[in-house]
From Swiss-Prot:
EC assignment: 1.11.1.21
GO biological process: cellular response to hydrogen peroxide; hydrogen peroxide catabolic process
Family to which this protein belongs: Belongs to the peroxidase family. Peroxidase/catalase subfamily.
Protein name (Swiss-Prot/TrEMBL): Catalase-peroxidase
Catalytic activity: H2O2 + AH2 = A + 2 H2O; 2 H2O2 = O2 + 2 H2O
Gene symbol of the encoding locus: katG
Length: 729
C-alpha cells in the first residue's frame, strides 16, 4: 500500500523541509515577486481597518509601566529570575529586537515585532528570549490591542532600566505588528548557524549586513571567528555598530550600559540544548532550546555559553562595569560550556559577585573578548576612560544611545505616540519644520501648474526630479521621501542617479517660481520647494496624459516643508543613496546584482505591488525620466506622452531581442528586417520574460488597456509622492 499523501501538498506522513519542490527550487534564479505582496491584510487578524494609533491613545501607559515594574521582580518557577529580577533578560530582549537594524537598507529593527517570527525567534543569539516574551504574555493579554508586541518589547526594556535606577531618555509608541515572517530581509547566504561567508578576502563585511556571523545580532562575543583577541575584536565592534548608524561614543555607551545589568549563561555545553523554537517538537508549543542539563533553568541555564556577570551589582545602575574593566587585569579562561571568556585576577572580596540563584556562592567578574575591546581598541579606549571618569556623561550618552537604538526604525516624529515622547529633537530623526503658514488651495495650485509648465522644463526633467525626491523613501525604516526637500542639498544633489546637472537646472527654475509666488501671494500663503517639486512632476504627468488624449487630474496634497542643510545629516542620508533605480534605468557600474532583483527590492521599499511596479516603470519610460536621457527601455516614438506604448511594444512578436555583451546587461531589439528598433536593460525585459509580470503587461497592452494604464499610473504616482506624508495620516 502506498504512503498516504496530503491532497494539497503531496506530502507523505514523513514531512521534511524539502518535501515539496516549489517553483523557486526548479528555477532558483527566478525573481521573487512574493516580496511585493507579503503582509497582506488577509494575514492580519485585526483586519485592515484596525487603527493602532487610536487604540494606543486609549492605553493607560502609566498602569502598564507599573505592571511591568512589578513583573520585573515576580520570579516564576518555570523560569526563575536572576537575583530575583528579570531586568537583564528584558533589556536583552529589547536590545536584540532593535539591534538587528542596519542603516544600509533600513531593514531589521524593532518596528514590527519581527522577533516573534522566524528566523529571528530562532537565532542562536536570541536563545531563551522566547521565555522573555512568554513572561510578557499575561500583560499583553491584559492590555490587548492597545499595545502592540513591538511596542511592548521595547517598553519592557525601558521599564527594566528604570526599575534598576537608570533614567531613560523617553519612550515613543507607534510600532505596528506584523503577522508573518519578513521575506524581504537578506540576513546572509550562510546555511549554518554561526558561520561566516559574508566577509571578503580583505575582511570587509558584505553590504547591507551588520552582524559578523549568521544568527548573531552583533559580533561574536568570544572574538572574531571565536578567537579571543580583544584588539582584533575592536574593529568588528566599531564596524557593526557603525552599520547600525551609531557613533563611536554611542557604541561604547551601548556596550557598557547594556552590560551594566544581568549576566551571561553557560552552565554546560550548548549541546545540552534541544532545537530552537522553529524546530521544536509540537508539544513544546513554540518554546525552544529545551535544556537537558540538570533542572534546565536558574543556575543550570545555558544561553551564549559564556558564564558570569560583569559587576558586583547586576541589578543596579552604577559605574561597576568600567570600574571592573579598568581596575583588574584579566585572565583568559573557558566557561563550563567551553566558551572563551576573561576572568578578573586577584579580585577584592567586595567585588565578588553573589550567585544569581545559589545563596552563599560567589564568583569573580567576567568580561567577554568583545567587552575588553573597549579597553584595548585605540579608538574606543579613550571614550571608555572618559565615561569611567564622568558618570553623568556616561549616563547621558547611554540614555540617548538607547533611545536612538530602540527608535531608529520607527520613522519621523509624526509617528511617535504617547506621553513619554521627549521634546528634544535629534538630527537622526531627519527633522522637518512644522507647518507655519496657510496652505495653497485649488486656485493657487492651478495657477502654479500653469507657471511650472510654462518654464520650458521638459516633462521628463520635471517627472525625474519629483521621482528622485520621493523615491528615496524606504518603508523599512520610513526614512527618505520628498518632504523636507532635501534633494536640494548634499548628498542627494550630487548623486549620479539624480542627474546633478539637470537637477540643478530644474531646481533653479523652480526656486524662481517659488520666490515669485511667495512674494505675490496674499493672505500669508506660501509654497515650499518640497511641495513645488512634487507639484511640478504631477503637472507634467497631467500634461503628458492630455497629450495622449486622457484628461486627468493628479491629486496633490500640499503641506510639505523645507528642511535646512543644518537639519540634514549628510553621512546618514548618504545611506539612502540607491545602488540601482530600475525605474530610471540606472545601476551603479560593477554592481554584482541583477537589475531586475534591484528593481524588485526598490519596489518593495516603496510599498508597491507588482501591478504598481509595472505601470510606474512603463509610464516613467515613455515620459522620458530615464537617467541621463538614455534610451534603454524607451519603447515609444512619442516620448513625453503618457501612453501604454512600452507595454504594447514589449509584447511585439516581430521584435527579436539579443544581448549586447556576455554580461547580458543590455539588449537590442531588431525588427524583421534586422534593423535596430529598440534598446533595453534587464529591468525592461524582465516584464516580458517573467510570466507573472508579462501577464500584468498584457492587461495594459490590450486595446482596452490604455485608459486603465493612465489611471493606474496616476494612482501609483500619487502613492509614491505621498509615502512620507505621515503628518496627514
Amino acid at each position: 500500500m502506498s504512503d498516504l499523501k496530503c491532497p494539497f501538498s503531496g506530502h507523505t506522513g514523513a514531512v521534511t523541509a524539502s518535501a515539496h519542490t516549489g517553483n523557486r527550487q526548479w528555477w532558483p534564479i527566478q525573481i521573487d515577486l512574493g516580496l511585493l505582496h507579503q503582509h497582506h491584510p488577509a494575514s492580519n487578524p485585526l483586519g485592515d481597518t484596525f487603527d493602532y494609533p487610536a487604540a494606543f491613545a486609549g492605553l493607560d501607559l502609566e498602569a502598564l509601566k507599573a505592571d511591568l515594574a512589578a513583573l520585573m521582580t515576580d520570579s516564576q518557577d518555570w523560569w526563575p529570575a536572576d537575583w530575583g529580577h528579570y531586568g537583564g533578560l528584558f533589556i536583552r530582549m529589547a536590545w536584540h529586537s532593535a539591534g538587528t537594524y542596519r542603516g544600509a537598507d533600513g531593514r531589521g529593527g524593532a518596528g514590527h515585532g519581527n522577533q516573534r517570527f522566524a528566523p529571528l525567534n530562532s537565532w542562536p543569539d536570541n536563545t531563551n528570549l522566547d521565555k522573555a516574551r512568554r513572561l510578557l504574555w499575561p500583560l499583553k493579554r491584559k492590555y490587548g490591542n492597545a499595545i502592540s508586541w513591538a511596542d511592548l518589547i521595547i517598553l519592557s526594556g525601558n521599564v527594566a532600566l528604570e526599575s534598576m535606577g537608570f533614567r531613560t531618555f523617553g519612550f515613543a509608541g507607534g510600532r505596528t505588528d506584523i503577522w508573518q515572517p519578513e521575506e524581504d530581509v537578506f540576513w546572509g547566504k550562510e546555511t549554518e548557524w554561526l558561520s561566516d561567508e559574508r566577509h571578503t578576502t580583505e575582511g570587509a563585511l558584505d553590504q547591507p549586513l551588520a552582524a559578523v556571523e549568521m544568527g548573531l545580532v552583533y559580533v561574536n562575543p568570544e572574538g572574531p571567528h571565536g578567537h579571543p583577541d580583544p584588539v582584533a575584536s575592536g574593529p568588528d565592534v566599531r564596524d557593526t555598530f557603525a552599520r547600525m548608524g551609531m557613533t563611536m561614543e554611542e557604541t561604547v555607551a551601548l556596550v557598557a550600559g547594556g552590560h551594566t545589568f544581568g549576566k551571561c549563561h553557560g552552565a554546560a555545553p550548548v549541546s545540552q540544548l534541544e532545537a530552537e523554537p522553529e524546530g521544536a517538537e509540537l508539544h513544546q508549543q513554540g518554546l525552544g532550546w529545551h535544556n537537558r542539563f540538570e533542572s534546565g533553568k536558574g543556575e543550570h541555564t545555558i544561553t551564549s555559553g559564556i558564564e558570569g556577570a560583569w559587576k558586583p551589582h547586576p541589578t543596579r545602575w552604577d559605574q561597576g562595569y568600567f570600574e571592573m574593566m579598568f581596575t583588574y587585569e584579566w585572565e583568559l579562561t573557558k566557561s563550563p560550556a567551553g566558551a572563551w571568556q576573561w576572568v578578573a585576577k586577584d579580585v577584592k572580596p567586595e567585588h565578588m559577585i553573589p550567585d544569581a540563584h545559589v545563596p552563599g556562592r560567589a564568583s569573580a567578574p567576567i568580561m567577554t573578548t568583545a567587552d575588553l575591546s573597549l579597553r584595548h581598541d585605540p579608538l574606543m579606549e579613550p571614550v571608555a576612560r572618559r565615561f569611567h571618569q564622568d558618570q553623568d556623561a556616561f549616563a547621558d550618552a547611554f540614555a540617548r544611545a538607547w533611545f536612538k537604538l530602540t527608535h531608529r526604525d520607527l520613522g519621523p516624529r509624526a509617528l511617535y505616540l504617547g506621553a513619554d515622547v521627549p521634546e528634544e529633537i535629534q538630527i537622526w530623526q531627519d527633522p522637518v519644520p512644522a507647518l507655519d503658514h496657510p496652505l495653497i488651495g485649488a486656485v493657487e495650485i492651478k495657477a502654479l501648474k500653469q507657471k511650472l509648465l510654462a518654464t520650458g522644463c521638459s516633462v521628463g526633467a520635471l517627472v525625474a526630479t519629483a521621482w528622485g525626491a520621493a523615491s528615496t523613501f524606504r518603508g523599512s525604516d520610513r526614512r527618505g521621501g520628498a518632504n523636507g526637500g532635501r534633494i536640494r542639498f548634499q548628498p542627494q544633489n550630487t548623486w549620479e542617479v539624480n542627474d546633478p546637472e539637470q537637477l540643478r537646472s530644474v531646481l533653479q527654475t523652480l526656486e524662481t517660481v517659488q520666490q515669485q509666488f511667495n512674494a505675490e501671494a496674499t493672505g500669508g500663503q506660501r509654497v515650499s520647494m518640497a511641495d513645488l517639486i512634487v507639484l511640478a512632476g504631477s503637472a507634467a504627468v497631467e500634461q503628458a496624459a492630455a497629450a495622449g488624449g486622457h484628461s486627468v487630474t493628479v491629486p496633490f496634497l500640499p503641506g510639505r516643508m523645507d528642511a535646512s542643510a543644518d537639519q540634514t545629516d549628510t553621512a546618514s542620508f548618504n545611506l539612502l543613496k540607491p545602488i540601482a533605480d530600475g525605474f530610471r534605468n540606472w545601476q551603479r557600474s560593477g554592481l554584482p546584482l541583477r537589475a531586475e532583483e534591484c528593481l524588485v527590492d526598490r519596489a518593495q521599499q516603496l510599498g508597491l505591488s507588482a501591478p504598481e511596479m509595472t505601470v510606474l516603470l512603463a509610464g516613467l519610460r515613455v515620459l522620458g525620466a530615464n537617467n541621463g536621457g538614455n534610451r534603454q527601455g524607451v519603447l515609444t516614438d512619442r516620448v513625453g506622452v503618457l501612453s501604454n506604448d512600452f507595454c504594447v511594444n514589449l509584447l511585439d512578436m516581430s521584435i527579436r531581442w539579443s544581448p549586447t555583451s556576455e554580461a547580458m546587461e543590455g539588449y537590442i531589439g531588431r525588427d524583421a528586417q534586422g534593423s535596430e528598433r529598440w534598446t533595453a536593460s534587464r529591468a525592461d525585459l524582465v516584464f516580458g520574460s517573467n510570466s507573472q509580470l508579462r501577464a500584468i503587461v498584457e492587461v495594459y497592452a490590450q486595446d482596452d488597456g490604455a485608459s486603465r494604464f493612465v489611471s493606474d499610473f496616476v494612482q501609483a504616482w500619487v502613492k509614491v509622492m505621498n509615502l512620507d506624508r505621515f503628518d496627514v495620516r
